[in-house]
Amino acid sequence: MGDLFWTGQEIYIENIYRPVILGTLIFFVVLAGALAFGLFRHYQLLRLGTKENRFDQIFTRLKITLTEVFAHMRIIKEPYPGIMHLLIFWGSALFIIGKLIRPFSYAVELSNPPQAVFLYASLLSEIGAVMIIIGGLLAIYRRYIAKPSRLDTKPDDTLIYGWVFIILLTGFMAKGYRIAAGGIQPTDWATWAPVSYLFSKMLPTFDTQSYNEVLVWHRAVLHTIPAFMFLLYIMVNRSRLQHILLTPLNIFFRSLGPKGALVPVDLEKAESFGVSKIEGFTWKQLMDLDACTRCGRCQDNCPAYLSGKTLSPKKVIQDLKQHWYDSGPDIFGMFRNKLKGKGIDTGVSMIGGVITQEIIWDCTTCGACQEACPAYIEHINKIIDMRRNLVLDQAEMPETAEMALRCIEERGHTCKGTTACRTDWCGDIEGAKLLANDSNVEILYFVGCSAALEDRNMKVSKAFGKILRAANVNFGILGEEESCCGDPARRIGNEYLFQLQATKNIETFKKYNVKRIVVTCPHGYNCLKNEYPQFGGEFEVLHHSQYIAELISQGRLKLKNNLDKAITYHDGCYLGRHNSVYDEPRTIINALPGVQFKEMARHGNKSFCCGAGGGHMWMEEKTGVRISEMRTEQALETNCNVVATACPFCLQMFEDAIKAKEASEKIRPLDIAELVALAIADEVKK
């Protein structure tokens, strides 16, 4: 069977494949030129951005990229589109490998054993083509019949589907004709080219004298030329299929720093603050725009969009991308100016025109968009950069946000109108001592503005203080020396104020030789842990959920009281998505006696924002549904009587939303510290 097959291959190579290879080589030259043109255009557009170092940790980047590209770790999280994309991706890989084996093995005169090489190459191509067709049909059904709202269909999408099917169909037809008219026993082809064999049964045979001419016409005109034109189209026309190259590149250059940390600004060297024009973004931020495939996963997970706000993270990226492309007609002239030292200036402001202020302020910086994006696009830094420009260069921001910033500047906290001082909460807590009196402590409890000064959250700090006392922890506080961590200032866009606060707190920590800090606020936790190191503040920072879990595991806390509660847990964005602290709060809840724990539908890294992040604790939601009320509805669906939190902002948002929905009799928000305090108290309040 193998000899008969190989005889057919020799005839094919001598009479048909030589001219096809020659034509292919000519097309390859054209394609190489088109590829060079496309890459040069992308390179020039990327150079429009400012410098940024993303070339560190090369091997780590390579490992992450290969894992994401070949295993589809993020894409497969949604089963239907994940399986669809896997079929198309691996089908294309098998198809291309099978197609390349023949010409390359012929070029190196592979002959040991050539029969097996060609047979397996044929089978690989057939399997790959079938996988592409199945994946393509799934994609067509999803896009044109199911029509999920996050997808927008453009002519390019429809053209791609049709073009790919034509290429595959003509390939089957060409091989099918070879089988029908080539005089080769059908048993060989039924095994090694099953789909083409089926086509051979539907195709007419021709006079032997016309066989070669017909086959060349099929191969070159109906199959090879459309295939090369398809590749040419992708490279020149900015097709979405360019993500085949651009997405792996974007993944390779993804940020390897802490997810919750924003990029600092060098205030001394900055001539202006933030970004108002496209050329103000870094080259990597611009690469993000190119890598977007309009899949809409970010939009499907954005609490602002889902609650009816103007913001759509997908549209932000696409609008910036189009603006970036539109800024390119005189791009070569701009680079000539750059070479002459004149710099680049498109002269067009993004803020107000391309991206409205309303969109910029809608973002809660929850990170749901970035967590969902298979291309690892970084949305938050772009929005924060535009906020920085609005706040520091244009002095424009929501009035309530401005009041919060002014309060930090004048009082060192965000709690306007409070009459409390930072030590009122610990009046009846034995063992709490000021570092100014004794700095020889096991931990510093950095209380935070809300837990120190707001009535509802003072209950949390009191509960945590009782836990520390019960565990015989030698802890200290800063008292009036404590100042706002700076997170609200940074997320609202006042980088200058944030750096003042960070520097001030770092100096205080170092003055008392602080080594270990525990924080009850995830925003402060993220700030101290991930952002203070940018300014020389290297400390061990723990969230109180981590520390309580540690105390329980060490046997220093005895949870003895039966709580008799049904509890669901809300993953705060800055504890969960931004810092991957998911297990410790659940470990604590499951350790509580008499507790039935039930997850919300959206939990873990898919948790839904409470609506307070990104400075929204101090902003009004003027459009759509309140995000906090949407999250409260999700908590109510669990039929639990307690929604546990580990964040003062989340706790306050639940308090307000539950009252607004008149659900106080159904569910009660409690911090995990309050639950633990109940479990160790002499008398449990149900």
What are these model-derived regions, one by one?
Residues 35-53, 105-108, 140-158, 173-189, ...:
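Juxtamembrane/interface segments at transmembrane-helix termini
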Residues 54-55, 77-82, 114-124, 145-169, ...:
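Membrane-interface segments at loop-to-transmembrane junctions
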Residues 26-34, 133, 164-169, 217-252:
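Alpha-helical membrane-embedded segments
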Residues 86-96, 160-186:
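Hydrophobic alpha-helical membrane-insertion segments
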Residues 1-12, 105-120, 177-216:
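Membrane-interfacial helical/loop segments at transmembrane boundaries in membrane proteins
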Residues 2-138, 145, 280-289, 311-317, ...:
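Iron-sulfur-cluster electron-transfer modules
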Residues 259-313, 365:
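Non-transmembrane accessory domains of multi-pass membrane transporters/channels
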Residues 199-214, 261-273, 379-686:
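Iron-sulfur cluster-binding electron-transfer modules in prokaryotic oxidoreductases
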